[in-house]
Amino acid sequence: MTNDSASRTPSDNTELTEMQRYVTQQRGTEPAFSGKLLHNKRTGVYHCLCCQAPLFYSDSKYDSGCGWPSFDQPVSSEAVRYLEDDSHNMRRIEIRCGQCDAHLGHVFPDGPKTTGERYCVNSASLSFIDDVDGERVDG
């Protein structure tokens, strides 16, 4: 796995927006309640914006009220990787794309009863592909 974050771009070779670059390459966080995919209710799959690896199914998304898209589990155990994050004087678990290492967000142990986990993900790190019409929406 490479750590050359400056060379990563979305799979269609378009440029990352400033916010997408900040989130995925610099471990940033978009402002709460600002993400394009926060209120998305369509059926489909959420992919990594940078490499298009599948990350979360829409049926695992729920409204946690935290201001970022929340999921109770990834599509597979290999979809995301976990790192300890002690930044900002907090102990958290960072989640990154299991394929390209792009920063996604964090996972917390306060999720729904199904898994007990809340994957709190920045919209700017995701692409959504609709199951019905195949439309792709980048966060």
UniProtKB/Swiss-Prot annotation:
Belongs to the MsrB Met sulfoxide reductase family. Gene3D superfamilies: Peptide methionine sulfoxide reductase (2.170.150.20). The keyword Cytoplasm does not apply. GO terms for biological process: protein repair; response to oxidative stress. It comes from the Bacteria. PANTHER family: METHIONINE SULFOXIDE REDUCTASE, METHIONINE-R-SULFOXIDE REDUCTASE B1. The gene is msrB. This is Peptide methionine sulfoxide reductase MsrB. The keyword Iron-sulfur does not apply. The active site is at C120 (nucleophile). Binds 1 zinc ion per subunit. The zinc ion is important for the structural integrity of the protein.
